[in-house]
């Protein structure tokens, strides 16, 4: 089909749950154009819901709903059935199953998923920690980190730190450069809290050349040369061996996949 698939996310909260699932699903298709995901968040009354549903009808879209309030979910489902609109309710099949199993009734409170509870403030603290101790700005932070990521430049240390911080992990990271001694604090923390990140020389050269182009520098810089990359990777392996830490190859892995491997390793020690 020439036009992109239009998918409406309808939620009485933020709607990010549905959006993540849609992206995971559409990634499995060779679409000519990326799916057009239109998120309609904080839909709390029938008037706003009807307006969105009418738009979905007019554009021949697909509806994906995460409406916690049963009344609104039923309204949306009925409208879609009557108008032949593909509709997926991500919440209520599971809600009904949990109610049947526990004998309890759902609170049907859309805001309950986003309470400013201790978990929320822990996440904010973890994000601030990741920013403060990114790139080993202050080695003292290594002593307080749940996870310490170690690797040469462009092995995804910073994006992984940010991603894991959003899962409430306090993460610090240390760049490995042959000319710069590693901080003594690394040897003062348990090896099971340290994760070494590495990749192949070919992949690292490719990523570094892209980085150099993006900032207007010559691709032929020593930063992306085969000799320099091999030297750094060898230094990295030597460092991992000294630290006694687990090592993950990050080439061809999404941030989410690498993060899952990291948390699996870290939690296996607890």
UniProtKB/Swiss-Prot annotation:
InterPro entries given in the database record: Kinase-pyrophosphorylase, PPDK_reg
Reactions that this protein is recorded to catalyse: N(tele)-phospho-L-histidyl/L-threonyl-[pyruvate, phosphate dikinase] + ADP = N(tele)-phospho-L-histidyl/O-phospho-L-threonyl-[pyruvate, phosphate dikinase] + AMP + H(+); N(tele)-phospho-L-histidyl/O-phospho-L-threonyl-[pyruvate, phosphate dikinase] + phosphate + H(+) = N(tele)-phospho-L-histidyl/L-threonyl-[pyruvate, phosphate dikinase] + diphosphate
Pfam family, one: Kinase-PPPase
Keyword set includes Nucleotide-binding: yes
Highest taxon in the source lineage: Bacteria
Group of enzyme by EC: transferase
Single annotated GO MF: protein serine/threonine kinase activity
Entry EC no(s): 2.7.11.32, 2.7.4.27
Record-annotated membrane-spanning stretches: none
Keyword flag Nucleotide-binding: yes
Keyword set, alphabetical order: Kinase, Nucleotide-binding, Serine/threonine-protein kinase, Transferase
Positions bound to ADP: 151-158
Family: Belongs to the pyruvate, phosphate/water dikinase regulatory protein family. PDRP subfamily.
Role, per record: Bifunctional serine/threonine kinase and phosphorylase involved in the regulation of the pyruvate, phosphate dikinase (PPDK) by catalyzing its phosphorylation/dephosphorylation.
Annotated protein name in UniProt: Putative pyruvate, phosphate dikinase regulatory protein 2
Native species: Listeria monocytogenes serovar 1/2a (strain ATCC BAA-679 / EGD-e)
């Amino acid at each position: 089909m020439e036009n992109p698939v239009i998918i409406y996310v309808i939620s009485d909260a933020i709607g990010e749950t549905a959006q993540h699932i849609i992206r995971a699903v559409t990634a499995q298709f060779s679409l000519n154009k990326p799916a057009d995901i239109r998120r309609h968040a904080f839909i709390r009354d029938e008037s706003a819901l009807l307006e969105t549903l009418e738009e979905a009808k007019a554009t021949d879209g697909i509806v994906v709903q995460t409406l916690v309030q049963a009344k609104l979910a039923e309204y949306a489902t009925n409208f879609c059935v009557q108008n032949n609109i593909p509709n997926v309710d991500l919440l209520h099949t599971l809600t009904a199953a949990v109610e049947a199993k526990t004998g309890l009734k759902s609170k049907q409170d859309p805001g309950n998923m986003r309470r400013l509870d201790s978990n929320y403030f822990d996440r904010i603290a973890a994000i601030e920690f990741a920013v403060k101790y990114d790139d080993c700005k202050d080695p003292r932070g290594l002593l307080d980190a749940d996870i310490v990521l170690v690797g040469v430049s462009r092995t995804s240390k910073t994006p992984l730190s940010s991603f894991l911080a959003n899962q409430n992990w306090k993460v610090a990271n240390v760049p490995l450069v042959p000319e710069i001694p590693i901080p003594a604090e690394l040897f003062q923390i348990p090896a099971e809290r340290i994760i070494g990140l590495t990749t192949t020389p070919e992949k690292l050269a490719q990523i570094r050349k892209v980085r150099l182009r993006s900032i207007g520098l010559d691709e032929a810089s020593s930063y992306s040369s085969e000799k320099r990359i091999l030297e750094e990777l060898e230094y990295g392996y030597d460092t991992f061996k000294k630290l006694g830490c687990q090592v993950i190859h990050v080439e061809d892995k999404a941030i989410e996949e690498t993060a899952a491997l990291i948390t699996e390793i870290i939690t296996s020690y607890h």
